[in-house]
Amino acid sequence: MLRNRARRLDYKIMR
């Protein structure tokens, strides 16, 4: 669960 949230935040910042 924590990995899924961290990937979503990283994707928004990367985009």
From Swiss-Prot:
Induction: Expressed in both exponential and stationary phase in rich medium; expression is slightly higher in stationary phase (at protein level).
Superkingdom, natural source: Bacteria
Name of the protein this chain belongs to: Protein YnaN
Lineage: Bacteria, Pseudomonadati, Pseudomonadota, Gammaproteobacteria, Enterobacterales
